[in-house]
């Protein structure tokens, strides 16, 4: 059994905002570099392997994560004021705030379980089944979508449904032929042909309209690949 614990604190991750003013050193558009985009990534990972018999192995992997934004972000933009003669007569400062505190990091499952059974009934033959389960997968989203304009939007992004899939693998090492080591293999991915959401974008530019709530009907989703096969032959010399 192997295990690990991690606690990673990301401080001031890069986030910029474009501001169009009609003035500014860069013409019509300036860039604000925001501060306070912090993330906390904490989790545990456990991996175990048990040989029940010389022909039977059992594997189990657990990954439990808790990844979220820690604190809000903000940035100030100072715009020069000009008179009709294009002379500076003052300046105006605008503060931009982003409601990020407590929101979950998206685009990857934070919880996963993997169970595997490997059979080796005869010399050179290996048959394996792997069942993978994914949970706590929050949609991908950008911190700049949480700019405060009136009431702060602090609702969590849409979380995709949990899902599992079964992969099957078979390999057989052929007897040596003319000094060549050859192995044939066959793989069946998503053997149960499950339909699942593999990735999602919260309030996407294509689906996020109308009520703008963080729900499935406003998300852009990408389904996982249906059942598919792979055959292979490897040669070592």
Short names for language-model regions:
Residues 4, 154-160, 171, 219:
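Short, glycine/charged-rich beta-strand-loop motifs at protein surfaces that mediate ligand recognition
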Residues 6-11, 32-143, 234:
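Gram-negative outer-membrane beta-barrel transporters
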Residues 15-33, 70-102, 139-156, 198-219:
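Solvent-exposed loop segments that connect transmembrane elements
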Residues 38-42, 109-113, 162-166, 180, ...:
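Residues that define the transmembrane beta-barrel architecture of outer-membrane proteins
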Residues 53, 57-59, 63, 160-168, ...:
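Conserved long hydrophobic alpha-helices within structured protein cores
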Residues 124, 133-144, 172-237:
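C-terminal beta-signal and adjacent terminal beta-strands/loops
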